[in-house]
Amino acid sequence: MDGLMKWLSDVFAPKARKVFANPWIDTVASTMKKVLPIILTGSLIFFYNVFRSYLTFLPDLSPIANFSFGLLAIFVAFFITHEAMLKLGHGEYQINASLISVASYLMLCRPQVVDGVFQIDNGRIGAAGIMMGIVVGLFVAIVFHLYAKLHVLENNDTLPDFVSDWINNIIPITITLGLSMIFANVLKLDLYDILVSLFMPLQKGAQTLPGFILICFVPVIFYSMGISSWVFNAVTTPIFMVAIAENIEAVANGHAPMN
């Protein structure tokens, strides 16, 4: 046992800390902390609605939940790219890249325009789409990161600075939205359905007793070695949010919670 503890503290823990210090992993962990107030805001309204079901004179605050918890995937897509640009040292792209991440997310949701009305499945922009938000946010961050490494017009002396900034934003924006268009509109692929299919085994496994124990036990083990449990939120938060969203929908339809 002493040998195992020595190996964990002297060999495994330093290597694990180095892995979790990776800016891409740290980006996801940081995003989960950023969106927590939004999650709690929606949760507070759901808790309030429990009392409202008995005290019917209370006002309906559901719009607050719909535009906080109900837009969680969009917020995640924004914050993933925002945090990545910050941690990778590309502050000049921080806002534009984050906004394009939202645009790419909406495009990849494959919305429909019916009689001039923009329609999108509400479930895709809420908690159920959080994994897609992470993937899209990382995709946009990678495109902007790779472009930033080219240092285009960095030593330019002829063009005004604002023109150089325009060009350096137009190119990665066009590439990002172009690739999203090819995926969603040309190839007709549904990223949401693809990720749900890939994520479902993990989601179902987490609902079992062994899965639940692992979700609770693994972060505790790493925390004992000085590694913050926040780094595991990239995996656990999507699982929890999808399960919570399913429970909310089930109760709203008059059924018992399933998770």
Q: Model regions: which residues?
A:
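Membrane-interface interhelical connector segments
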Residues: 236-259
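Signature of multi-pass transmembrane helix bundles
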Residues: 1-39, 45-228
